[in-house]
Amino acid sequence: MSQKRSLVFAIRDFPPGCGTHIDVSSSLNHPAEKAFKHPRTGDVSGENLSFAEAKPEGTCLKRESADQDHIFAAPEHNAKREPAGQDHVVAATTVAYATSSHRQKVEIGNSDCDPTPREKVLEVLSLFKQVYNQLDRDKKARRGGDFLDATSRIDLKTLTVLEKMGKQVNTEKRIGSVPGINIGDVFQYKTELRVVGLHSKPMCGIDYIKLGDDRITTSIVASEGYGYNDTYNSGVMVYTGEGGNVINKQKKTEDQKLVKGNLALATSMRQKSQVRVIRGEERLDRKGKRYVYDGLYMVEEYWVERDVRGKSVYKFKLCRIPGQLPLT
């Protein structure tokens, strides 16, 4: 019986001005990869991505529907515009990936100054891309064995590697804007959202923090289609709550409950707290989704309605805060 070769990841840091450095594009786009297609928990890969098209900013009008049972509305609020970073420069870092069969060195950018938040985000995304591509090329990534080798979700393995290397940024959860993230930034995997601190729960559509006895939403990943039927219209979003086996027709469905993420969204409405919104959009090639940061929203109201199977489903109406940069 042959013995498995181990997979080792190492980091080599050169002083400023040493080593050979290459430039990295400021875009967040990634090369084509194989597609995965779970709407909230699965991540996808595909063609080179670009920023989302501009969408009109509209007013938030009250919802009228015969399906609703009870509506819970938020009080009036005034929101301030959040600034967005503009520069696209990457700080210098050298990373070496070593396996038993080959060794590859990746060098990222060059800077004599401390990196800005934007530079840190672009650096870790470039590193994510390099680690992902190497794992995808390595035959061990497709073999059975330990957890690192057994799963076909290479993006999850990439996330594990970067976390062990301590390469995440914005690791502390926060409400509102995330340093280094611009409206319109495109991500190819939900695991990338965790690496940059935009949304820390790749397996859940609602992320939240605990403040005292309350859970307050920090971000949501919304998806059109499937069983969720999240909708967008001129700065107004209707988001379907979590739970109840909404998308899996093979499992028994249940009524959604006002707990965990759903409760956090309701609390965000009562406390007039900002929520980051990331859209999971179907790609033009229809081979999966990409994830676009849309900006900050406020939860205006929520209600319970019956789905096609007769189960209770929570719906949350969110309105985009005026004054933010549009998607470009």
UniProtKB/Swiss-Prot annotation:
It is found in: Nucleus. Keywords: Nucleus. It holds the Pfam family SAD_SRA. GO terms for cellular component: nucleus. PROSITE patterns: YDG (PS51015). This is YDG domain-containing protein At5g47150. PANTHER family: HISTONE-LYSINE N-METHYLTRANSFERASE SETMAR (PTHR45660), YDG DOMAIN-CONTAINING PROTEIN (PTHR45660:SF23). SUPFAM superfamilies: PUA domain-like. It comes from Arabidopsis thaliana (Mouse-ear cress). Residues 176-320 form the YDG domain. Disulfide bonds: none annotated. Its main location: nucleus.
